[in-house]
Amino acid sequence: MATVDVINGDSISTLHSDIIQTQILTRLDGPTLASTATTSSYLQTLCTEEKLWQELSIDTWPSINDPRVVQAISSFPSGYRSFFADSYPFTEHTWQSEKHDPPTGLISAVDLYYRGEIIYSKVQEMETEKGKSGWFLSSPFRVDILDPKESVQTRIRYPGGDYEAWVKDMEESMKLNWILIDPIKKRAANISSRKAVSARRNWLTGDLEIRFSTVVTAEAAEVAAVVSCGSAEAWKEVDEEVGGEIHVRDVRLQVEDIEGKCMKGRDSLVILQGLLDGKRSCKDDEERRAKERYEEYVRMKIQWRENKERREKAQDTICMIFGFSMFVLLWSFILLR
């Protein structure tokens, strides 16, 4: 949404409030609207209108125009204004004590874009079980937005030819908002990196997997929202020479440890709670920094894997030396009797 220069608070008070709200304030984006409210008490009253923030929020995230989300936002301290203040900035993880019960009843609001146009929206409630023995808490954490046999038709086409160039274009053209809402604690957070941090082919399925990740360095973990795109025919891979129509095959959320394994439900929910409670940042370069953090995390994963392989190799060598020494000692004992 475009921004406009804000008129001086004294001069703008001469304009009718309806003109200001319908012709001026509706042209502002969220951060500009919030800063405009601080210029005068008159503008503060106009800028805090619930309908204004509701329309701005729905324009930004179409998926939230869902009865379940509307009901959840209605309980926020300042309604849509509080929701926008939580969801628009990037969030930094705050450490959570494992003694605290993990959040329950979380809602996911997902909006997927291609070259600025929305191609998919959905709201899904996260069914979690209470208690330490619940299967959800002890199983690998994964939230699937699409059903196994479901796919989303898009206007995206792979023209054929240079596959790597198409992969790069897809990485740059796709954008994802994944807003996590906690109706109980009345908090929300956009846990996606917005722009993709990586795109690579899954050699098992042949689909292109595009990742929108938030790295939690303190926990050595990655909150990964993954979008899989493939051929319109489910049984067929994209032909790299001929090309063809592309469908969205999978949209999922998972929390991975440094080994790339999906973490258990309880540990994952604790990390997600840390993002919901985390400090917010609206710096202009946050999308670039999110990708840089991911690339640094990938390097850290490679270093960790190499160190693990060296340790295992050293342990194998020690075991071999010990076994050989015992073998020599045994035969020496037998021969010298």
UniProtKB/Swiss-Prot annotation:
Top-level taxonomic group: Eukaryota
Positions of the F-box domain: 10-58
Protein name: F-box protein At2g27310
InterPro entries noted in UniProt: AT3G44326-like, F-box-like_dom_sf
